[in-house]
Amino acid sequence: MNKIIYINKKINNFKKKIFVPEDKSLSIRCALLASQALGKSRLKLLDSEDIRSTLNCLRRLGVRIIKQNDYYHIEGRGINGFNFKKNLVLDCGNSGTLLRLLPSLLVRSPYKIKLIGDKSLSKRNFRVAEPLKHFGAQFSNNKTPPVYMKGTYFVRPITWREDIASAQIKTCCLIAGALHAPGITKVIARPSRRTTENLFKHVLKIPMKILKRKNYDQIEVRGINQFKSFNYNVPGDMSSAAYPLVLTLLSKKSELIIKNVNVCPTRIGIITILRKMGVTQKYIKFRNLRVVKGERIANIFVKSMNNLKAINLPKSFNNSSAIDEFVLIFICAAFSKGISTFRYLEELNKKESKRLDWGYKILKMIGIKTKKIGNHGIKIWGNPNLELKKNYVIKNYLKDHRIAMSTAVLGLARGGSWKIYEPDSIKTSFPSFIKMIKELGGKIN
């Protein structure tokens, strides 16, 4: 039987301090890299389905992992130190990040490995086969899972040009180059999240250069023989913080402090967009801003605001900095004054579900005038005075966690009676989401 969450009442005004779960992208990268280090790494990671999939894959590759209290102890045997048998199958669950980064550790695998995922992941593009082929790896059925991969003993460094701003493809190339290829690997790509670069530079001490050009970055990494184990407390995820942030912003007479969040410039695109929509420091502000191991960490203060302005998002905006938050941004635009336009977002339809289409569908459902722009954009006629009073049903059968949480925020902030299917999908990134909503005073069943 499909599970459903019910929301029948707006959230009351609140004034709270909360924490959000650890950064999912950073948690997966830390776990994967710890498996290649020499010695035992001690990591405080996100506890979610995607991280469990990551750790289960590493265990099947022969990595010893123990959890003690809130910390994972991952015992690496060095680069290419995996120990596994032939005909191995690795289940990536729902994690596109894991699917695309794990193969970078397997470039020298002597055996064929099969990578699979759940129903949603099996429809998503694999993407990293082409750069890994240049390193020397072999693939069959390399478009969507299941993917079959075999490594090579003769890995060569590459120069890879990437037209889209994809932190995952960039990371896959950087890890494969640093850990397996002698010489210098270069990645030339549009700017994207620098999570991996910060780990290399500030935590693992892997030599690299970042050359910033007008429209792209050129990143160079030199192949290494080994690196030491490390300790890391992963900070809060901006993508998770976005939900209570928007809930507070769109609710009435509420204030919230979200503590210990990763606010690296390439992660805070939603705040950059909200600034352009008139959200000043009075309504969203960073407090206790500091830099820890290359990442900017802050407590985010947010309070309710009822006069958002429409936005025409420029082509120059780095969409990758808000790629997981655009459905929330569309919801904010729906309650702003004026006509908002968002373009060049075709990447949204390559996520767990077609999120650009979902954004259009949700806004039409609640009575917002909305128009599609080709296959890449959306135009939204905002209505600040709209009150939601009808019954709404979200049949989230592809189990997209961000659709479930975005529509929950919409119902809690602006009313209506909501039935949202497949709430278990939330466990992918934010297992404590419903608990957090209840702590803020929301009625969600």
Question: Where do the PLM segments sit?
Answer:
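Structural preference for solvent-exposed beta-strand-turn elements
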Residues: M1-N445
